[in-house]
Every structure is written in structure tokens, then in C-alpha cells.
Amino acid sequence: MPLRYVERPAPAPLAAAIECVWSVSDREARRARPLDRLLPDGCPELIVHRGDRYGRIVDRRLVRQPAAFLAGTLSRPWIVQAPPRVATIGVRFRPGGITALFGAPLTGTADREVPLADLSAPLIALAAVIRRARGPASALRAAEAWLLAHVAAHRPDGRVPAPGCAVAVRAIHRRRGRIGVEALAAAAGLPRRRLERLFRRETALSPKQYIRIVRLTALLHRLDAPERERLIDVALDAGYFDQAHMARDFKALTERRASARRGDDGELAVHFTRPDRLLRLLSGA
């Protein structure tokens, strides 16, 4: 029986900071589970394992993840394996969303499983609320209710402020990653060094890294089209010098070939790279 994945989009008061809350579960325990390749998408996530913990390949060994942690924004893929009994909840934040909601800087958190105690006491409280819920659906509702109450208690207008990097992020998405850092700084009205510090603080990535990830997102969306285009045409349209340039960048970010199929990334990973989600990411919705 396949994993059951459920996604609940963030309501309007949270939408500036949070994309969604999600759950993945399985009604029957399974011993032999395939690996998943989780690709960079620019979004850090709160992960709470209510059942057995996922494992992640680290230095060629499978290491069990903490029961609750922040999955720092990825600049390279994570290879993970579901446990026998799956019951996991995620809160997927937008770029800059954690800093906007909780004031926690993300500098130095990229590609890490970050202890919640290193970030923000409210994140610990949110994880506890998720753990206490009776089932996946209750956990998603409880997480959303807690986040709405947190915003109402800390913001007079009941809405999350836009992240400081929001203008630059929108410019990158609007161009689908076809923009240089100097042009991005000009679009954001910031000196380059200040923009780089802001990006590190709010996304854990440099502007250049984030640009590459958005360009990857655009590529994944095009490569998954029913009628596949010639790779050279895709490469040139995406702003690469040639197909070889695209292939090198794609391999560096995904550790797989551009010609591989999305379904090969794993039964959890395919939900994160659905065409509709990639399109929403590119549009900033």
C-alpha cells in the first residue's frame, strides 16, 4: 500500500510565511522501503515524526533523524528512507517565513537537521502541539490553529509581515532564475552585500544559490511536461550557455541526470515536485 500524503494550504493570514502543512502516513507497517531523493526547493520545513523516524543517508550511512527538527533549506538533495511505521507532519515555510513569524535567523542552517532549541521556543511549542494530536488530520488542524493564534497574539492586524527578502524573491521567481545577483540587488533597491546578508539570515542561502534553485524548479516543471522538449532547447531558454552547462548544474543540485523521470525520485519525493506545486512555486503563490 503506498504512502498517504495530505497537504493543507496555509490560510490567508499565514500565506506570506507558510506554504502549507502536510502529513505522510501508512496504514500498514512495511520493512523494505525504497529511498527518496528530496530536491532543493528553497523552503525550510518543520518536521515532526509522530511514528518511527525517517533515516537519511549521511556519509554513506543511514542515520535516523531527530523526532522533531527544522530541515534547513536545501542546496543539495537529501536521500532519505521511510521507516516501517510512517506518521510524519511537516510545516513548509516560504523563504523568509520563519524569520518573519518567529524572528529566528537561519544563517548557517542550510542542509542541516537543526534542533528546535537552537532556533525559537515557539517552534518547540508548535512541535509539542503536533505530537499531542490524535491523528494526522487532527495534527494538521492543530498546527494551523496554533500558528493562527500565534500570529493573532503577536501582530495587531493578525497577519504575518512580508519577509525582508520578499521583493528579491519575487524578482527571482518572475524571471524564473534568469537574473544575476547585481541585477537582483538593483531590483530590490539594496547594496549587493546587504542583500547577501539578508538572504543568508532569512533563507540560509546566498542569492546565487537561491537563483540556481529557482532555475532548477523551472527546469523540473518543463522536463515533466507530457511532450518532452529537446534538452538543448530547454537549456538555452533557461539561460544556460549550452546543454552541457545545464547538465552540470542540474547534476550538482539533484545528483541525478536531467533525463531521469520524476517518479524515480521516490513515493514521498514525487509529491514535492508535482507539476502544480512547481508552478505555484514559480508564481510565488
Question: What feature does the model see in each segment?
Answer:
Residues 199, 211, 250, 262:
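DNA major-groove recognition helix of helix-turn-helix
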Residues 1-192, 202-207, 221-241, 257-285:
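Alpha-helical bundle regulatory/interaction domains
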